[in-house]
Every structure is written in structure tokens, then in C-alpha cells.
Amino acid sequence: MQFTELFKMNKIQPDPCGSGDIMTHADKLAIGVISGTSADGIDVAALQGTGIAVTQTHGGLTLPYAGDLRAELLALMRTPERVRGADLSDLEARVTTAHVAAVEGFMESAGIDRDRVTVVGFHGQTILHQPADGYSRQLFDGALAARLLQIPVVADFRAADLAAGGEGAPLAPVYHQALSSPLTPPQVI
């Protein structure tokens, strides 16, 4: 599957800033951000590519969560009954701000100017994932991140994939296909 098909499948607005060129096959620089359920840190990496193939990697960075934020996230994950329907907007804003700070730190350390970045994809912090029930809850506010970064943001990948009958991990196969496409078969990913 190509990135353009992924955007369409997930009903992601392909060009939220109106530049008109995010879906072309010219080289684009994308930053991806994820944090695992261990909440040990925020992983940031950058790839440049055409939407079909990766043409250059720009390294990565892991920024640990602050101890109090990590402790609060882990406590919440241990009590799933507190997650469904709960108002977690304050915690979500703190998580979002931490993720934005990680992106800004990464761009600075990698020497990446924000004007070069086409899009930043944020997974958010998963606090409850029950794909059999079609339910997943990530803490992340994409609109807040876009305002803080002033870069187009895509987020909430799991919800659309779950709604389409998936397991809530729509980017992993596309990412692996893009990275492995230049390799000679057979391949094990």
C-alpha cells in the first residue's frame, strides 16, 4: 500500500495547510513520533521519501518522559476501568506538550529546519488498546500539536484502522514495505 492510499483509507486530510503539494511524489521530509506502552520515552525519527520509497533517513532520538508524567501514565494503564469515558484532557495536554518538545529537540539536534518538514505523524500515548472490542485510547491532541509546531500534523491512526476492521496498527506494514523495498527477496521483517 502506498502512503497516498493510507491517507485516503484513514480519511486523513492530505493537505491541512493548503499548500496543495503534500500528495505529490516529490521528496518530502516526514517526522514520526511514537511512545510505547512501557512509557519509557518518546521516539522521534525522520524519513525523506517520495510517498512510495524512502530516499533518506535522518536518524532518531528517544526523549524519556519526566518521572511524574511516566508514573501517572503507568498508573492509568494499570487501571483500565478508569480510562473509558474519563476526562483526561489535562493529562492529554501534558503528553502532547512532551511529544512536541521531543520533536523540537530532535529537529534541533538533527539540524532540521521546520520549513523543510512536510508533516509530523504522532501516534500518541496508548493507555488502553482492546482491538477485539474495537477500542483504543491514545492520549494526544493533534490540533494542539499543530498549533505549537506550526507544521502539518496527522494523528489518531488507530481509530480509523480499528473502524476498518484492523488491529489498530495501520502504519507498520507501510513503513516496513517502504524501508524494505530496495532489498533483494527473500526478506524477513
Task: Enumerate the predicted regions with their spans.
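Short acidic/glycine-rich loops and adjacent helix/strand connectors
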Residues: Q2-I189
